């Protein structure tokens, strides 16, 4: 990673990351948070990687383990972009069907969608699931887009912009005042 000496350096580096990533490349994001890992997410990630390789789709599709999107009771959770198709309780056995149907044929695997118990209405996108629908996801809203082991994912989404502002555009007094106004008190809140 290059040295960042100004906000312009950070923005230039972010643009380089974005340029390397194909916006047309499908992305399979598998929750790799503790809850999903406990229910088999690592095996799901491995199954997707193997299936993508088997089908010769490495240039069209990337597979990422990501942060927790929050709906742990329904994990492992898989989100496929750019369509934002959200599948719940995915197993390695589901992977060939997902790759064939959703990745190759652009069809939805209905049985893996969220289904509202009250009215049996299915939600295709994470944002349409009642658990998420009314949430304002300020802190973990991008978790399903970020591999916690890949700093480029964070930078591509604008990560470190607040730090850059504090370092290069604010005085020490302004930084202290901003922290006081925020109400932050440490790890415990």
What spans do the regions from the language model cover?
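Feature of Fe-S/electron-transfer and energy-metabolism proteins
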Residues: 1-189
């Amino acid at each position: 990673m290059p040295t960042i000496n100004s906000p312009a350096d950070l923005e230039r580096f972010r643009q380089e990351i974005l340029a390397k990533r194909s916006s047309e490349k499908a992305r399979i994001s598998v929750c790799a948070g503790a809850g999903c890992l406990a229910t088999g997410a690592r095996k799901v990630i491995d199954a997707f990687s193997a299936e993508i390789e088997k089908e010769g789709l490495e240039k069209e599709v990337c597979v990422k383990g990501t942060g927790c999107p929050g709906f742990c009771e329904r994990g492992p959770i898989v989100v496929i972009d750019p369509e934002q198709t959200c599948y719940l309780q995915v197993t390695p056995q589901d992977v060939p069907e997902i790759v064939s149907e959703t990745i190759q044929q652009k069809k939805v695997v209905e049985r893996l969608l969220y289904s509202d118990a009250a009215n049996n209405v299915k939600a295709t996108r994470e944002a349409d699931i009642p658990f998420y629908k009314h949430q304002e996801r300020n802190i973990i809203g991008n978790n399903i887009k970020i591999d916690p082991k890949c700093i480029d994912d964070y930078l591509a989404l604008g990560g470190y912009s607040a730090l850059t502002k504090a370092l290069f555009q604010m005085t020490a007094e302004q930084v202290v005042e901003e922290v006081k106004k925020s109400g932050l008190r440490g790890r415990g809140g």
